[in-house]
Amino acid sequence: MIKWPWKAQEITQNEDWPWDNALAIPLLVNLTAQEQARLIALAERFLQQKRLVALQGFELDSLKSARIALIFCLPILELGIEWLDGFHEVLIYPAPFVVDDEWEDDIGLVHSQRVVQSGQSWQQGPIILNWLDIQDSFDASGFNLIIHEVAHKLDMRNGDRASGIPFIPLRDVAGWEHDLHAAMNNIQDEIDLVGESAASIDAYAATDPAECFAVLSEYFFSAPELFAPRFPALWQRFCQFYRQDPSQRLRVSAAEGDYGEESEH
């Protein structure tokens, strides 16, 4: 159990969101105009349904809130807003935060430790984030704190705890589990060879299946070129679950860019 310091400032509702500016980040640049319009519609509903709460002196404004909402809704662009019904509040610290973490080990002993967290989510609880890492989530780099925590929430729709297997048809579970564990083993092999800091995929993905699903969801949306060719079978399973193909978006965007350059000559 984590004990949180509740010193909060809640954002007020604002109907005049700066969507054009909010969309102007590398993570969202490859969306089509139609996808952007649907993403904005979802983000507007998100801001109506969820409370964004600024903690420890952090200040939210309309642009920050709009970008947060857009990133929250990117994973559920084709799933629907109801996939985010497992929480009602988003708590935002200015930076990674220290909390008192208590847990019980296998023999029943309770341990307590102060730990630094970037984010946190759990069943039917709020999502906890920090602004420094949210800002780093705007890039197409493979790191995205918001998508990571959303993936945990989507994962937990399939049960009380995150397992790495989201809500998919029962016939697909065994194949998903096989491909996910194969990816974990592959990532661990690379870590053993070159070390955590030099690994091409965040080493956190090798810790357990739930974290592997969350980390690879970050890469799925923000660095598909690192995910798709390395784990093609698992990539296809992610495409089927999220009902999106960011790698295809990237190819189309690159082709359009090449065409535009040729037209200028």
Swiss-Prot record:
GO BP term, pick one: proteolysis
Enzymatic class: hydrolase
Pfam families: Peptidase_M90
Annotated EC: 3.4.11.-
GO MF annotation terms: aminopeptidase activity; metallopeptidase activity; zinc ion binding
Family affiliation: Belongs to the MtfA family.
NCBIfam families: PRK15410.1
Biological role stated in the UniProt entry: Involved in the modulation of the activity of the glucose-phosphotransferase system (glucose-PTS). Interacts with the transcriptional repressor Mlc, preventing its interaction with DNA and leading to the modulation of expression of genes regulated by Mlc, including ptsG, which encodes the PTS system glucose-specific EIICB component. Shows zinc-dependent metallopeptidase activity.
Subunit: Interacts with Mlc.
Protein name (record): Mlc titration factor A
